From Swiss-Prot:
Gene field: mnmA
Pfam entry (one): tRNA_Me_trans_M
The keyword Protein biosynthesis belongs to this UniProt entry's keyword annotation: no
Protein's job: Catalyzes the 2-thiolation of uridine at the wobble position (U34) of tRNA, leading to the formation of s(2)U34.
Designated name of the protein: tRNA-specific 2-thiouridylase MnmA
Gene source species: Leptothrix cholodnii (strain ATCC 51168 / LMG 8142 / SP-6)
Length: 380
């Protein structure tokens, strides 16, 4: 559903080494466009580390470019990434929040630094392998960001900070396809990375243990872990290493002798429920459905709207408070466009609403934008 293009345009594709961007480049070539590829290097440290895949990703991207008969350029955006994305990532973790760097990376690197570089190369548009769609609405004159047609792969959540100029210059060729079809095409045309696994995790961390990585950049102070009755049940290694809803790695499994706090039986797993920075205390509760893990109201800041701004009292809205979550009906209770803040409520309780993560709003299949969760109520 991308805007209809003239017969031939110069399109610069962000070729990551993965199958989605590779098939995107092939589809554009099939449509008769002049396609040029750029491989973005966004993280410079540890190139020789067992956890870093950047070198192999570039080799895969170069192999794809060779098969497709297109030029590829290796561009280093590591300095921009550290200044615009990683520095904010560390600030948020230091403040006890859990940021989503992929959202900021898209807005600041892939659709700003990369877009600017592509335009200097004479590009008419850029393209990436994201599962999303762009549509021009003639009634409003606005470009709209739509969910990808594959509900299991939709990445509009991570793209909600894009603006009108960025959307007008961007194509998402695989957004109209299910992932299974993308894999089929890759195998059929003989792409060398057709069977490559999808990347997971935060791009600059790779496959390394998260705690090990974060420990290199943030100071930390151990402190008590308490349950919902205020009883000490363990010790944490530093609040920055934990996020709300976390189950693994808390270090208090098997404490059945502590009894059964509200919402969970004595054999149920423990979850991180609260972080108190003032007292350096981590709170954990037993049971997925514990009241402390349920919220129906939240406040958010740093709001970014793609086009139409949702209004208090507007019906038909839904939201996600984390990626891969099903849309949940919501209401905007208050919104300050100048301050870029909003407060929201949900008819149904939301699980482990986490400060620092994004709340993204939708009207049907249209992504309206979103904001960074500042705080959420927790049922007593």
């Amino acid at each position: 559903m991308n805007t209809q293009l003239p017969p031939k345009q110069r399109i610069v594709v962000g070729l990551s080494g993965g199958v989605d961007s590779a098939v995107s480049a092939w589809l554009l070539k099939q449509q008769g466009h002049e396609v040029v590829a750029i491989f973005m290097k966004n993280w410079e440290d540890d190139d020789d580390s067992e956890f870093c895949s950047s070198r192999q990703d570039f080799l895969d991207a170069a192999s794809v470019a060779d098969v497709l008969g297109i030029e590829i350029e290796h561009v280093n955006f590591a300095a921009e990434y550290k200044d615009r994305v990683f520095a904010e990532f560390l600030r948020e973790y230091s403040a006890g929040r859990t940021p989503n760097p992929d959202v900021l990376c898209n807005a600041e690197i892939k659709f700003k630094a990369f877009l600017d570089h592509a335009m200097r190369l004479g590009a008419d548009r850029i393209a990436t392998g994201h599962y999303a769609r762009v549509r021009h609405n003639p009634a409003t004159g606005l470009h709209e960001l739509l969910k990808g047609l594959d509900p299991l792969k939709d990445q509009s959540y991570f793209l909600h900070r894009l603006n009108q100029a960025q959307l007008a210059s961007t194509l998402f060729p695989v957004g109209e396809l299910p992932k299974t079809e993308v894999r089929r095409i890759a195998l059929e045309i003989g792409l060398p990375n057709a069977k490559k696994k999808d990347s997971t995790g935060i791009c600059f961390i790779g496959e390394r243990p998260f705690r090990e990585f974060l420990n290199r950049y943030l100071s930390h102070e151990p402190g008590p872990i308490k349950d919902d009755r205020g009883r000490r049940i363990g010790e944490h290694v530093g609040l920055s290493f934990y996020t709300l809803g976390q189950r693994k790695g808390i270090g208090i499994g098997g404490l059945k002798e502590k009894g059964a706090p509200r919402g969970g039986g004595e054999h149920e797993p423990w979850f991180v429920a609260r972080k108190d920075l003032a007292s350096n205390t981590l709170y954990a509760v037993q049971g997925h459905d514990h009241p402390w893990l349920q919220s129906q109201r939240l406040s958010a800041d740093d709001a970014s709207w793609i086009g139409t701004v949702p209004q208090p009292g507007q019906g038909g809205l839904a939201a996600k408070t984390r990626y891969r979550q099903a849309d949940s009906a919501c209401a905007v209770d208050a919104l300050d466009a100048a301050a870029r803040t909003l407060s929201m409520s949900f008819p149904a309780p939301q699980w482990a609403v986490t400060p620092g993560q994004s709340v993204v709003l939708y009207e049907g299949e249209v992504c309206l934008g979103g904001a960074v969760i500042a705080a959420a109520d927790q049922r007593a």
